[in-house]
Structures are given as structure tokens and as C-alpha cells.
Amino acid sequence: MNVLFAGGGTGGHLYPAVAMAGELQKRVPHVKLSFAGTEAGIEAREIPRLGYRLHLLSVRGLKRGRSLGALVDNLGVLADFIGAVRSALAIINSESPDVVVGTGGFVSAPLLLAAQMRGKKTLIQEQNAFPGVTTKLLSLFASEIHLSFEEAKPYIARKKEVYISGNPSRSFSAIDPDQARLRFGLAESLPTLLVFGGSRGARSINNAVLKWLDQITASANLIWQTGSLDYERIKAGVTSSARIWIGPYIENMGEAYAASELVVCRAGASTIAEVTNTAKPSVLVPYPHATGDHQRHNARALAENGAALLIDDEHLQAPESRQLVLDLLHDRTRRSAMSKAALLLAYPDATAALVDRIIRLAKS
């Protein structure tokens, strides 16, 4: 069996593909796996490190807006795309994959298109509640489309071979909450707030938490991943380390989720998958500049089902937002209801389910 994964740029597009590749290796002896990406994406570093073959394409996204500069730049983008499709056709010819799996990012469009032009089986895995342009267009010709949210269905023109499969994400071993808190050097008996904004951090979330710090630590623990860009600034602004674990990056997120009663975070697809799979009530702060405002759609999908609260980035530092977080942190009954709602939205077997479909397509 030969499977080619096309996706990347960010971890949100890459890691679902990596999870599926790992599952395929476990289940299919001698499976041949390769990836396609761009030199500027996270895949250029991660895929060779993981030992997979990587094909690099030159492709970039369209600039939004109607200015002359945007128009001129987009003509260059179109020329790059045509060149990328030619390169993708060469990759398809040389690799001869049984299935091409697209997980999003600029690179998935030329690879999926080239595969469809060559009559190859294609599977699209869409992570967000608001599908991207590539998914909307190429889903018309894909063998199968797999969505992570029921809310994404209305944006897909076709109705056959469309599945809700969830988003592949990291799996975490069961850990005792008290033991997990001890590993962060925190009191076992206090409710714990987990805050993070990705590996690089989220400045608006960090600024808000810095402002709320005294009120949080008066009656709760705090596990705070600041991100690499903000760590030194935030660390300098924290006058007491009592009841706080603070760091640029959390090595073991399973322990962090186990230790916490409530999570404050962005609403990227991978994060959504993790908070639902771990049944964590959350306060979601969508990144306001995400393409198509897709993080708001993700957050709304949880909020409307009772699994999360949604706070706009611009309102995060308001006193009402701080009080909302503190009240929820100490409201066990409400948190329990949100936890149950989150679990109903979870797809802990997403990776296995998607690999089942890849194997089926390859054999058909």
C-alpha cells in the first residue's frame, strides 16, 4: 500500500496527517508513506525528523483585498500554483500512490488536484467547523470527505461520501489529578486553571491572565504555558510563584489536562479535539485573524452545545470576562455539565476511523 499525505504549513494541518501515518505503520506491514509540503511550513522540519520522505512544492496563499498590490501579488500566486500543479503531477507519477490524503494548508490543493487529474483515490480531512476553500472546491471530486464538526456539513456542496470522523489528535494516558498537580508542584486540594495559547503563545490571553493573577491564585492553582515569545516578559511580571506553574511550553499536556478543572485557550482544531477528548470544560478565545474566522466557528460549535464559553479576544480583559472565568472555575455543577457535553462532541477514535477508510479506499 502506498499513501501520500498532502498538508502542512501549521501544526494544525500537519499533525493529523502524522497521526494517520503512524497508525498506518502499525496496521499495514510494509506500507509506503510520503508527504508533500512547502519549505516555509512546519513540515520542512518535522517530516524529515520523523523519518518520512518529503516532497517540497513552491505554493502560497492568495492575498485578500482589492488593492493593486494584492492583484499583482495574486497573479504571482496563480503562476506559482500552476507550477505547483505541474510539480504535483510529477510527484503523483513517480510515487504512484494508492490514496492521496489532503489535510489542508496551501500545499494540499495542487496535490489533490493533480491526484484527481490522474484518477487517483483522494480523501480530504477537514479539521475546522468552517471548511477552507480547498475543501469546498476539491470535495466535489474527492473519493471521500471527512469532517471534524457536524457544523461543517452545510458548506460542502455534495452530500454523498461525506463523513463526520473527528480530528486525529494526541492521545493521553489516564493520570490521577492529584498526582498530576503534584508534578507541577501545586496543591492537590485546589481547583486548577490551565491556560495556553500554542507553542508561540497568545499575547492577549497572557496579558489578561497577568491582570487576573492575584484573583486566580487567591483560591486556585494556575498552570500557564506562555509560549516562547512571551515567557521572559510574563515571568518578569509575576511577583509570586505560589500556586503557579509557569513555563514557555508544557512537555506533557496529558498531565496538564489531568491536573486542571478548566481550560482557557484558543480554538484551533487540534485544541478543540484535545479538550473534547479529555472532557475538559473550556473558555475559548478565538484567534481573531484566523483565515475565514474559522476559530470562531470552532468555538461556537462547542459553546452552542454547552461544552464551552466563548469570549471575544477584544473583550478578554474586561472585568466581566475575568469574573466569568473565576465563577466557572469554582462552579463544580456547571463544570460537570460542560464536561459531559464536551465528551459527547469527542472523537477519541478519529485516527483509527480515518485509517480504516484509507485502507478501504486503497483496496477498492
UniProtKB/Swiss-Prot annotation:
<dbReference type="GO" id="GO:0051301">
    <property type="term" value="P:cell division"/>
</dbReference>
<protein>
    <recommendedName>
        <fullName>UDP-N-acetylglucosamine--N-acetylmuramyl-(pentapeptide) pyrophosphoryl-undecaprenol N-acetylglucosamine transferase</fullName>
        <ecNumber>2.4.1.227</ecNumber>
    </recommendedName>
</protein>
<keyword id="KW-0808">Transferase</keyword>
<keyword id="KW-0132">Cell division</keyword>
<keyword id="KW-0131">Cell cycle</keyword>
<keyword id="KW-0472">Membrane</keyword>
<dbReference type="GO" id="GO:0008360">
    <property type="term" value="P:regulation of cell shape"/>
</dbReference>
<feature type="binding site">
    <location>
        <position position="295"/>
    </location>
    <ligand>
        <name>UDP-N-acetyl-alpha-D-glucosamine</name>
    </ligand>
</feature>
<keyword id="KW-1003">Cell membrane</keyword>
<dbReference type="Pfam" id="PF03033">
    <property type="entry name" value="Glyco_transf_28"/>
</dbReference>
<dbReference type="GO" id="GO:0051991">
    <property type="term" value="F:UDP-N-acetyl-D-glucosamine:N-acetylmuramoyl-L-alanyl-D-glutamyl-meso-2,6-diaminopimelyl-D-alanyl-D-alanine-diphosphoundecaprenol 4-beta-N-acetylglucosaminlytransferase activity"/>
</dbReference>
<dbReference type="InterPro" id="IPR004276">
    <property type="entry name" value="GlycoTrans_28_N"/>
</dbReference>
<dbReference type="GO" id="GO:0071555">
    <property type="term" value="P:cell wall organization"/>
</dbReference>
<keyword id="KW-0961">Cell wall biogenesis/degradation</keyword>
<keyword id="KW-0997">Cell inner membrane</keyword>
<keyword id="KW-0573">Peptidoglycan synthesis</keyword>
<dbReference type="GO" id="GO:0050511">
    <property type="term" value="F:undecaprenyldiphospho-muramoylpentapeptide beta-N-acetylglucosaminyltransferase activity"/>
</dbReference>
<comment type="similarity">
    <text>Belongs to the glycosyltransferase 28 family. MurG subfamily.</text>
</comment>
<keyword id="KW-0328">Glycosyltransferase</keyword>
<dbReference type="GO" id="GO:0005886">
    <property type="term" value="C:plasma membrane"/>
</dbReference>
<keyword id="KW-0133">Cell shape</keyword>
<feature type="binding site">
    <location>
        <position position="250"/>
    </location>
    <ligand>
        <name>UDP-N-acetyl-alpha-D-glucosamine</name>
    </ligand>
</feature>
<dbReference type="InterPro" id="IPR006009">
    <property type="entry name" value="GlcNAc_MurG"/>
</dbReference>
<comment type="function">
    <text>Cell wall formation. Catalyzes the transfer of a GlcNAc subunit on undecaprenyl-pyrophosphoryl-MurNAc-pentapeptide (lipid intermediate I) to form undecaprenyl-pyrophosphoryl-MurNAc-(pentapeptide)GlcNAc (lipid intermediate II).</text>
</comment>
<dbReference type="GO" id="GO:0005975">
    <property type="term" value="P:carbohydrate metabolic process"/>
</dbReference>
<feature type="binding site">
    <location>
        <position position="199"/>
    </location>
    <ligand>
        <name>UDP-N-acetyl-alpha-D-glucosamine</name>
    </ligand>
</feature>
<feature type="binding site">
    <location>
        <position position="128"/>
    </location>
    <ligand>
        <name>UDP-N-acetyl-alpha-D-glucosamine</name>
    </ligand>
</feature>
<dbReference type="Pfam" id="PF04101">
    <property type="entry name" value="Glyco_tran_28_C"/>
</dbReference>
<feature type="binding site">
    <location>
        <position position="170"/>
    </location>
    <ligand>
        <name>UDP-N-acetyl-alpha-D-glucosamine</name>
    </ligand>
</feature>
<dbReference type="GO" id="GO:0009252">
    <property type="term" value="P:peptidoglycan biosynthetic process"/>
</dbReference>
<comment type="pathway">
    <text>Cell wall biogenesis; peptidoglycan biosynthesis.</text>
</comment>
<feature type="binding site">
    <location>
        <begin position="10"/>
        <end position="12"/>
    </location>
    <ligand>
        <name>UDP-N-acetyl-alpha-D-glucosamine</name>
    </ligand>
</feature>
<dbReference type="InterPro" id="IPR007235">
    <property type="entry name" value="Glyco_trans_28_C"/>
</dbReference>
<dbReference type="GO" id="GO:0030259">
    <property type="term" value="P:lipid glycosylation"/>
</dbReference>
